[in-house]
């Protein structure tokens, strides 16, 4: 899954004067027992399309999933359970709209208001999704302090409840920084937290280290590793994202 910082880093660049379209493809692997004693593994391969026009950014993410011993899905979301040892197929599609309230011209502060809708395109009978719509509202903020850029996210997610479950609607937050470490290369770290989704569950707590390298004007690549510190987070995770701007 793409970490929270991925969307923030995309907004650090200078706003384009005209409309722009970009795509990305990623590959993410995560592993953990999530407090069950049985190890679950997730391969997550998202294809992303993003269109920017003025202060607005529109994005759609369509992923492919492969889950071993399904317990949780991408982003630590709970799954129905009761499926085979290995399931794979289309994941849930996520769309988002982002309004840049501040573009950096006011004191160097970037402030984005973001709304997301998760469409239940994954097969819940294969434990690849819940079969319900989810909704997210969040605020992203970033500011440069010399060569270091600090960033943060604060948001709230509304889960669609399954007939035999009652999910809580959690608040989540992220805090991190990024800085140049070489020519066309940026590195940083972020800490992500989210309230528990079920009463018997745990909060998400995880640390991400990342590096982004600009290959050319049109291409860049991002590598990251994640360490979880709770039963709701993976024991270990890593991945890469390749971006292309048209």
PLM regions with names:
Residues 165:
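Active-site cleft segment of glycoside hydrolase catalytic domains centered on the general acid/base Glu
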Residues 16-162, 170-246:
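Transmembrane beta-barrel domains of Gram-negative outer membranes and organellar outer membranes
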């Amino acid at each position: 899954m793409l970490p929270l910082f991925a969307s923030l880093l995309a907004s650090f660049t200078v706003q384009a004067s005209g409309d722009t379209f970009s795509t990305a493809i990623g590959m993410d692997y995560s592993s953990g027992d999530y407090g069950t004693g049985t190890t679950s593994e997730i391969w997550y391969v998202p294809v992303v399309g993003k269109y920017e026009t003025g202060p607005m950014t529109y994005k759609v993410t369509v992923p492919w999933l492969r889950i071993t011993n399904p317990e949780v899905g991408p982003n630590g979301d709970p799954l129905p359970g009761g499926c085979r040892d290995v399931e794979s197929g289309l994941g849930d599609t996520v769309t988002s709209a982002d309004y840049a309230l501040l573009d950096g011209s006011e004191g160097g502060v970037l402030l984005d208001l973001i709304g997301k809708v998760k469409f239940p395109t994954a097969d819940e009978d294969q434990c690849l999704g819940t079969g319900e719509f989810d909704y997210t509202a969040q605020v992203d903020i970033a500011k440069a302090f010399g060569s270091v850029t600090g960033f943060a996210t604060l948001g709230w997610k509304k889960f669609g409840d399954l007939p035999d479950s009652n999910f809580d609607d959690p608040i989540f937050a992220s805090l991190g920084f990024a800085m140049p470490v070489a020519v066309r290369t940026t590195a940083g770290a972020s800490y992500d937290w989210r309230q528990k989704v079920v009463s018997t569950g745990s909060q998400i707590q995880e640390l991400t280290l990342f590096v982004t390298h600009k290959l050319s004007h049109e291409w860049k690549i991002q590598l990251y590793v994640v360490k979880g510190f709770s039963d709701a987070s993976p024991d270990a995770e890593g991945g890469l994202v390749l971006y292309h701007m048209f």
